[in-house]
């Protein structure tokens, strides 16, 4: 290592482990060159066609298909170069005691290479043009090394929040999540480095929107019902998904999720539950297969087979929003996903949506009154088991 390492013991151990794994994985390329073999990388394909739903584990997993990136293959040489460049930057950050963000890595690696082609003409090539290109390279390194970017101490913007009767240790400090006033604890980008000390909660409630999270927080929902209240502020980041998984897996707390009643809200639930297609290689640690969809359900709005709707006809007219062509297309896509389309309850929900072609935001339920939302709608659905599994 270069220089004396700093940080708490947990960080130092993570740094040492990641640096060792990266060194061993990429040192193989040097061995190939020494032995006269063209260096190449074999990386699992991160595509929809190589994403499989494992019904036994209830999560999306990456398949066995791999792609080869060879240095001497003209079609693959640029991506090969990008992968080695990014790996070297990450490794250097590890041994230099740095905590780069994904944006930092983009800028550190972005430059123009000037060279001459076979005919002697001068050429210029950027290492990468946009951040989404460098982000994709980081994901390739994750699947190649088996390390996640959090393991490599790569930071990202904090997005998720949590509040509740729980104490944790982070960076050597003990934090009481019940004593943050009207604020909440921002879930750090390296949630595996958080130590759970003690908790007094009976379940986890994840709400899609930050505004709804704040309403429930100020209403004292988590105090009254002994809950840990979490939000991913829309599409959840990896840290929030991992934190929720840990709460369920390590503390054995049931997880309930509330999103808008539309195809995009349903997909957010799916991401928490089974994982995402783009990050299927991370589902084992990010997904929470037993997470339950509490609402807002289409059957909450229209009723179904004896279930009474929570909204009157007048309230439906007031709060319902007409579905867009994009919403309709997304709903049909969801039905094609086996983990949704083969689920009887989800078939009912989505076909009700396609029948009425309307959607509802969480705030519409809350508009009946915060007390109704916090003290009747949510607890009633939990008590009666009115969720989709």
UniProtKB/Swiss-Prot annotation:
Species this chain originates from: Aeropyrum pernix (strain ATCC 700893 / DSM 11879 / JCM 9820 / NBRC 100138 / K1)
Any one GO MF annotation of this record: DNA binding
NCBIfam families xref list: PRK04342.1-5
E.C. designation(s): 5.6.2.2
Keyword DNA-binding (UniProt): yes
Residues spanning the membrane: none
Function, as annotated: Relaxes both positive and negative superturns and exhibits a strong decatenase activity.
Residues binding Mg(2+), per UniProt: 208, 260
Catalysed reactions listed for this entry: ATP-dependent breakage, passage and rejoining of double-stranded DNA
Gene Ontology BP, a term: DNA topological change
Subunit record text: Homodimer. Heterotetramer of two Top6A and two Top6B chains.
Cofactor(s) this protein requires: Mg(2+)
Full protein name: Type 2 DNA topoisomerase 6 subunit A
Active site, renumbered: 107 (o-(5'-phospho-dna)-tyrosine intermediate)
Highest taxon of source: Archaea
Domain Topo IIA-type catalytic, chain residue ranges per copy: 13-161
Gene: top6A
InterPro entries: Spo11/TopoVI_A (IPR002815), Spo11/TopoVI_A_N (IPR013049), Spo11/TopoVI_A_sf (IPR036078), Topo_VI_alpha (IPR049333), TopoVI_A (IPR004085), TOPRIM_Topo6A/Spo11 (IPR034136), WH-like_DNA-bd_sf (IPR036388)
Recorded family membership: Belongs to the TOP6A family.
Pfam families with a match to the protein in the record: TOP6A-Spo11_Toprim, Topo_VI_alpha, TP6A_N
Keywords in alphabetical order: ATP-binding, DNA-binding, Isomerase, Magnesium, Metal-binding, Nucleotide-binding, Topoisomerase
């Amino acid at each position: 290592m270069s220089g004396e390492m700093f940080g708490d013991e947990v960080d130092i151990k993570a740094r040492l482990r990641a640096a060792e794994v990266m060194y061993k994985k990429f040192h193989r390329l040097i061995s190939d060159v020494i032995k006269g073999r063209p260096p190449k990388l074999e990386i699992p394909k991160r595509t929809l066609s190589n994403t499989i739903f494992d019904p036994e584990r209830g999560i999306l997993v990456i398949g066995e298909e791999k792609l080869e990136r060879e240095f001497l293959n003209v079609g693959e040489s640029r991506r090969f170069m990008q992968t080695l460049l990014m790996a070297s930057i990450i490794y250097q950050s590890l041994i230099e005691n740095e905590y780069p963000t994904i944006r930092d890595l983009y800028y550190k690696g972005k430059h123009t290479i000037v060279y001459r082609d076979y005919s002697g003409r001068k050429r210029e090539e950027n290492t990468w043009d946009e951040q989404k290109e460098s982000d994709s390279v980081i994901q390739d390194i994750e699947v190649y090394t088996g390390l996640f970017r959090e393991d490599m101490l790569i930071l990202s913007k904090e997005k998720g929040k949590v509040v509740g009767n729980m104490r944790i240790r982070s960076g050597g400090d003990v934090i009481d999540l019940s004593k943050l006033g009207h604020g909440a604890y921002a879930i750090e980008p390296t949630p595996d480095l958080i130590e759970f000390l003690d908790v007094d909660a009976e379940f986890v409630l994840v709400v899609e929107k930050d505004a709804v999270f704040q309403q429930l927080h100020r209403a004292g929902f988590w105090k009254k019902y002994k809950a840990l209240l979490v939000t991913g502020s829309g599409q959840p980041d990896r840290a929030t998904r991992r934190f929720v998984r840990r709460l369920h897996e390590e503390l054995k707390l049931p997880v309930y999720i509330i999103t808008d009643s539309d195809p995009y809200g349903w997909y957010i639930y799916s991401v928490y539950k089974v994982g995402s297609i783009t990050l299927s290689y991370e589902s084992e640690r990010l997904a929470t297969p037993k997470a339950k969809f509490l609402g807002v359900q289409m059957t909450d709005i229209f009723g179904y087979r004896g279930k009474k709707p929570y909204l009157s006809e007048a309230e439906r007219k007031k709060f319902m929003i007409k579905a867009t062509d994009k919403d309709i297309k997304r709903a049909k896509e969801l039905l094609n996903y086996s983990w949704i389309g083969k689920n009887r309850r989800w078939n009912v929900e989505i076909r009700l949506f396609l029948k009425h072609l309307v959607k509802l935001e969480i705030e519409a339920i809350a508009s009946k009154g915060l007390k109704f939302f916090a003290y009747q709608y949510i607890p009633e659905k939990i008590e009666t088991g009115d969720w989709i599994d």
